[in-house]
Amino acid sequence: MGQELTHETFVYYLLNKPQGVISATEDSRHKTVLDLLDETARHKQVFPVGRLDIDTHGLLLLTNNGDLAHAMLSPKKHVDKIYQAKVAGIMDEEDILAFEKGIKLKDHTCQPAKLEIVSVDRNASTSLVQITIAEGKFHQVKRMVAACGKEVADLQRLKMGPLSLPNDLELGDWRRLTQEELDALTIFGIPLA
């Protein structure tokens, strides 16, 4: 009586991407997110769903399900991404309103976004903020903060859609999605198995 083997069509990994690693499948100069996975995971030909800048850390989903990736990245879906930023400068009510209206950048006006001030250190002239955006333009969070006259010193992605960065997932570590996390992804209406 042999055990029945199941073949997985799609796999899903949650990575806590460290700084200094790029969100690509291959690169000749930098370590990539695939370099952090084991051979079994790499063999599944996964790719990152979206990108985090080389100096941004935090939640990154890797999968080989192109339909899900497309749905999660589609501008029509308005998938929220939540970042925590340490900012050089004091973010204030004026900045919150600017984010709500949509920050004007050189190449486009951002969709309205949410800026929440978590804490302010007036002595060090720094702020800790959470920023929620539905877009994913090049260096968008950093550029939005810069448009307010401040600078992002550290940027971490905490959430993407229904997925949250687990507190117990160390930088550079990864794991398969839990059944609960997979169930949460069904909101995109894409077959996951």
Model-assigned labels for residue ranges:
Residues 1-193:
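Basic, flexible Lys/Arg- and Gly-enriched helix-loop patches that mediate nucleic-acid binding at interfaces
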